[in-house]
């Protein structure tokens, strides 16, 4: 057996409850891309995955995929082949860049909240400044809905067009877009292209 796959045998050592956690973690990573430690309902799942990372690494290597993790951010991410990556339109790509900048700005502030928080109006102002135009209401709603599904943000308002609504910025934002990704996104924006982002779907 390939030495890298030896860890697959560890699945036999899991208890029934642990095996259920294993299946839940796989489903979460494949369907939602990220497991985020700071989300209360995912903390135990995050800890379980880190404890059993060799098993997960071996399992994902069988499908030519990988897990990427940053324990300082508390994020585990599924990285699949190119054909499994999300394709973002121009508004969505701009929004990711805006949220990345807002996340970096906000994380330097002292806060009692688990995640940096901004208002929808904060996002609109930054987005409009970056693009040199005004984001339309329909586009705003679509962008926030899409990126919420991608587990980059959470909108704490039933009305995505409410300027006073709050947006929680997840640590998956910087994790999913590194400096190379930022440069590629900016270049693609200049060419008017869609952009490939982190793997998974937005269910």
Regions found by a protein language model. Give the residues of each.
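Short acidic, glycine/proline-enriched loop segments that cap or flank alpha-helices
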Residues: 107-115, 131-135, 157
């Amino acid at each position: 057996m390939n030495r890298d796959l030896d860890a697959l045998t560890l699945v036999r050592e899991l208890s029934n409850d642990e095996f259920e956690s294993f299946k839940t973690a796989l489903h979460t990573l494949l369907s939602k891309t990220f497991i985020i430690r700071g989300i209360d309902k995912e903390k135990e799942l995050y800890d379980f995955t880190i404890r059993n990372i060799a098993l997960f690494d071996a399992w994902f290597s069988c499908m030519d995929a990988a897990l990427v993790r940053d324990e300082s951010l508390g994020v585990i991410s599924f990285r699949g082949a190119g054909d499994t990556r999300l394709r973002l339109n121009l508004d969505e790509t701009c929004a990711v860049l805006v949220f990345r900048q807002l996340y970096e700005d906000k994380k330097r502030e002292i806060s009692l909240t688990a995640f940096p928080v901004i208002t929808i109006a904060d996002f609109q102002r930054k987005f409009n400044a970056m693009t040199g135009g005004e984001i339309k209401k329909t586009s705003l709603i679509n962008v926030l809905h899409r990126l919420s599904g991608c587990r980059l943000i959470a909108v704490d308002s039933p009305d995505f067009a409410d300027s006073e609504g709050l947006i929680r910025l997840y640590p998956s934002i910087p994790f999913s877009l590194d400096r190379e990704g930022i440069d590629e996104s900016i270049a693609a924006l200049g060419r008017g292209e869609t952009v490939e982002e982190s793997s998974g779907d937005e269910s």
